[in-house]
Amino acid sequence: MTVDVSDIPQYFANAVRRMVIREVPTMAVEEVLIIENTSPLTNEVLSHRLSLIPFVTDLDNYNLPEECSCQSRLGCEKCVVRFVLHAEATDKVITVYSRDIQPETSSGIVRPFSGDIPVVMLAPGQRVELELYVRLGKGRKHSKWQSGIATLYEQDGKRYLYIESYGFLTPSRILKEAVKIVARKLGELEDHFMRLVSSGEQENS
């Protein structure tokens, strides 16, 4: 997605670009409960690979864990989506794909962005049984939550903002969320300085 931002001050456009990378929340696997893993991959490597799978993100029905009213480490139906991954090879080598990750309960639109992402290969007799906990997070905490890439460039005397999604959200939704975040931060900054001004006026009176 490419947007003409020639009429927007560069520092505002750059702020939006930074929010795309750092602040727009997306959903990814945060925790993996290993029930059984006899695959060639260690628990740590398998968990890491799963955490990098983009999940279609529902920003309208889920909260960031730190903002959820449950305030529980385990989470609730408003801040965590539980998935399971059960796979076993019997008489031949199989490849386990992201399509094999199934929701434990109804997950709405939340699902792996693509079903064709390979997770692990299993030889006959090997199996994996896992529980996955998918939560909202931000790119500034870990790159697995980075919504996409964003860059500013100039061409033919005009300035453009280019956004490419990793699959969590559509580019247009990413842009809308980034703009909302910039607006909110500006509002918070204004409130902060207004309080400082008010406090200074009271001290000088």
What is the predicted function of each stretch?
Residues M1-S205:
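Protein-protein interaction/assembly regions in multi-subunit complexes
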